[in-house]
């Protein structure tokens, strides 16, 4: 129910589901582990009407979010909406990573963790018990916007860091 319209170096998201932008340009991996792992990825969630410049990575919120609340968790006097964020048991489930990012942004916490695994593995798969722990954490440029003006909670979240560790 959403799309990312790309025109040159500009992206605009349309639709209520939003889009997750994954920036791996500064990420690293440890090849010696022999399985997927990642350190230092960046995630941004863009909602309906939000824009992203692919060259500068500058995120511009939609007009209704720009008119709402700007959230900078490092700002003096920051008053978080959430006091806690749960450990997410199915972090790649429908909407789970976006909720985790929003809760992290608008809380005093520095990080949120969650698990991802495939319960439908083949019995002879040597990595059948392998899953991943995703660690989402605030970076120096993690900020966001919030608006409830259109009848539902709507967050735009910029530059949450991501580490993925095999478990």
Regions inferred by a protein language model and the residue ranges of each:
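C-terminal and late-domain segments of enzyme folds
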Residues: 1-167
């Amino acid at each position: 129910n959403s799309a990312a319209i790309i025109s040159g170096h500009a992206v605009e998201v349309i639709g209520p589901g939003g889009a997750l932008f994954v920036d791996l340009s500064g990420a690293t991996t440890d090849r010696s582990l022999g399985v997927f792992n990642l350190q230092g990825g960046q995630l941004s969630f863009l909602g309906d009407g939000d824009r992203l410049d692919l060259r500068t990575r500058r995120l511009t919120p939609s007009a209704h979010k720009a008119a709402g609340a700007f959230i900078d968790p490092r700002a003096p006097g920051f008053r978080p909406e959430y006091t806690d964020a749960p450990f997410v048991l199915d972090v790649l489930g429908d909407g789970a990573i976006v909720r985790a990012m929003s809760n992290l942004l608008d809380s005093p916490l520095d990080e949120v963790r969650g698990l991802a695994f495939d319960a439908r593995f083949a019995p002879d798969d040597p990595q059948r018990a392998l899953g991943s722990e995703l660690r989402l954490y605030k970076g120096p440029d993690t900020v966001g916007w919030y608006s409830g003006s259109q009848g539902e909670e709507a967050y735009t979240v910029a530059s949450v860091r991501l580490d993925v560790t095999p478990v």
